[in-house]
């Protein structure tokens, strides 16, 4: 060992050692955004819908469909984590990258850089105290997808009835089940069951994306988790039945990249949702007037 190092006072060595350790830890850590920088991004791109307080009550909130997410409860629908869990940062970034088909939530894949997306995610997490005290649960395990076949679709149709999916989504999957007009989210907003025949699924058309919804549910909505009641085989059959309802799903493929949305499909979904929401709002208004 060098006599120079031995002669160096410990008070001089320790700060340098701590600095090196911190640098090493930072290099090996997951990318983390800067909330202060994220506030700037949020105020430019998000505040008009999600509001200054993250309560989903921005100036444009009444014109969006569905209503913008209220971030304050830390309740998010599109996750890879189990029911009731916080989402991962990757889950939140995925929504920013892909947007949500059939809704007013557009993609920011080219508008925001990866660093900017991480920054705004860090800022969004400041709206809910849950992120300071909880961690996301381990992500849902998805078994390998079996082949898409006529038999799997037939079995999936039976699973669809077994778990009363038609109660909300309707016998033909058109979102017009007996309970469709009475559903509310956790904030008391009318919520429309998804029309599975529209063409594309909000979370993505691939098998694993749909499978994950059955197992994780959609936090904050009437869509429950079936993790404790559905078997993996049943879940995959149900996935294939849901895919069979779509007029654009490539029936000869299993998973893979979905085809592009049909022209006007997104606008049709929005018009349909707005129409049903407007009808519900009118009924509520008439009730208030007595």
Regions found by a protein language model. Give the residues of each.
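N-terminal secretory signal peptides that target proteins for export/translocation
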Residues: 1-11
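Serine/proline-rich low-complexity intrinsically disordered segments, especially terminal tails, linkers
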Residues: 4-5, 21, 71, 277-281, ...
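Bacterial N-terminal signal peptides
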Residues: 11-24
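Electrostatic cytochrome c docking/interface patches
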Residues: 25-41, 131-161, 200, 249-255, ...
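Periplasmic/extracellular electron-transfer cofactor-ligation site
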Residues: 33, 39-66, 98, 102, ...
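Flexible gly/pro/ser-rich segments immediately N-terminal to CXXCH heme-c attachment motifs
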Residues: 36, 40-41, 87, 107-115, ...
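Flexible, glycine-rich phosphate/dinucleotide-binding loops
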Residues: 55, 77, 114, 174, ...
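Extracytoplasmic electron-transfer domains, predominantly the class I c-type cytochrome c fold
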Residues: 62-109, 117-124, 182-245, 287
